[in-house]
Amino acid sequence: MKRIIIFAISILIVLPTFAAKKEKVQQVDSLGRKIKTGWNFGVLPSVAFDADLGFQGGALTNIYYYGDGSQYPEYIHSLYAEAAYTTKNYGIFRVNYDSKYLIPKHRLTLDATYQPDAMCDFYGFNGYQSVYNQDFHKWKKDPEKMGVLEDYQSRAFYKYKRDLFRFAADIEGTIWKNIKWNAGVGVLGYMIDECDIDMLNGKKNVFDPATERYAQKAMDKNVEGLYEKYVKWGLIDQAEAKGGWHPYLRAGLTYDSRDQRTCPTKGIYADAFFTYTAAFNAKYGQQATAGYNHLQFNFNFRHYVPVYRDRVTFAYRIGTQNNIAGKSPFYMNTYLNT
């Protein structure tokens, strides 16, 4: 009886051992990569310095949940978070969630972003035909050269203040194999003004009564930037000059044959969609800003070509965005719908 019990115990001990070995073997995919299970994440800190925007500190992380790994390299849940900010009001705060398992047979993507920008680029209208003079904003270290270059205005001449808030909720479903439909809603909030020169100058904001000039590296707050001039000349309407809020609706089709969503090594991703964007400015009211309701069409094509196994991939993309109805405010002309 004791021998039978010992033999039974031996079987119970040995069988789990074989099962564990078998499970360990299965934790490698067809390319020899280790299959990830459970929760995985990485953190990347960031430190930077800009002469005008100051010191930056921040970090980003991407958290993935793979469950038992049976669907790897596809994840079950993905949460991306990023926060970075400078001492002169520039940064990004973003949270993004993505999953095709929270709602069965549908992919849900949620994104909330806030981007303060104390010195956002503004080079005027009409693309390459607009006048650009680098001497307007290129500060020279040698004060004698600065005296010769009378064109110099301010390092903030081609800048303006733009804070952007964005929230988006998108859902995707399958029509047939790699062909999918997608729809989404969201809101864009633009808060715009001229650059805060006093804040940007900081300790350099010193005015010398004797010379009637600011400190050598300080920007003169009495000098108008291109944005202020456009408002003054009427090229930028008062109803759009300070920004506004824009709820939008989106719908389209997608073709996706990529082998994986993150870091694909082969396949094609193409989408075509329409976005209808409304406009509202609390100061001027809906009637004044209704002229900025507009409809846009987007087409994007991405192709991933394997060069060496899954180690080296050649990728290229083309895309277009066209306003097909209505008028978009000037600050949204550089925003690319995705």
What are these regions (language model features)?
Residues 167-183, 244-259, 264-267:
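Extended amphipathic secondary-structure runs
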Residues 41-43, 57-59, 91-95, 163-169, ...:
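Hydrophobic, lipid-facing positions within transmembrane beta-strands of outer-membrane proteins
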Residues 239, 249-252, 260-338:
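C-terminal outer-membrane beta-barrel translocator/porin domains of Gram-negative envelope proteins
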Residues 33-42, 48-241:
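Gram-negative/organellar outer-membrane beta-barrel architecture
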Residues 30-33, 259-261:
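Short beta-strand/turn micro-motifs at beta-sheet edges
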Residues 1-30:
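Cleavable N-terminal export/targeting peptides
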Residues 64-68, 82-88, 115-119, 190-192, ...:
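Sequence/structural signature of outer-membrane beta-barrel proteins
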